[in-house]
Amino acid sequence: MKNRLIIGLEGAVINNGNMGCVALTCSILNMLEKISKELSTPITYFVFEGEENSVKNKNICKLLQIQEEQIYSVPTRHLYRIRSMIRHPIKTEKTIHKMRKCDVFIDLTEGDSFSDIYGQYRFNGGTNVKLLIEKMGIPLILGPQTYGPFNKECNKKKAKKVIESATCVMARDQMSAEYVANFSEKRFM
C-alpha cells in the first residue's frame, strides 16, 4: 500500500449556507474517496475555507462515511489581505504549515466564482490563495468551475497568471472555456 496522500481543497466549502456549494464539496470528496479505494491509497483532506466549523465537519464525515481524522477544515479568510496576515501571524503560520503538507491542491472556487463579479475583496482573496499555492510549488488543479467575466483588466491578468500556472484546468461549461481562450493559451481538459 502506498503512503497517505494529502489533498488540499481550496474554494470547496463545508461551513457555508449555500447548500449547492456544500453539495459540490461532498461530490468531490465522494469521488476522491472512490479513487482512494480503487488505488488502495488513503487520502487525508484539508478543506481550506473561510472559517472552520467542527459540527458541520462531523456531519459531512457522517454523511459521506469518511473518518473524522481524514477531513480537516482550515480557515483561510485571514490570508485574503496582508493586513490580516500581519494581525494574525500565528493563525497565518498554522494555515501555511498545513498548506505545505499538501501533495496537491484542487480548487473549485465554489463552482461558479472565478470572476470579479462578486467584488474585489472576494476575487483578490481567493486568487491570492491560489497564487500562494503555486508560489509554494504545490501542483494546483483548477477543478470544474466557471471562469469570468472579469470586469477589470488587472483582474483578468491576475486570473490568467493563475490559469497558466495551474497543473490542470477544467471548465464547467463550454462558455467558460471559450471565454478563457480569448486571453490565455492554456488548454482545458
Language model region names:
Residues 2-150:
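Aromatic- and Gly/Pro-rich donor/ligand-binding loops
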Residues 123-127, 131-189:
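Active-site-proximal region of nucleotide-activated glycan assembly enzymes
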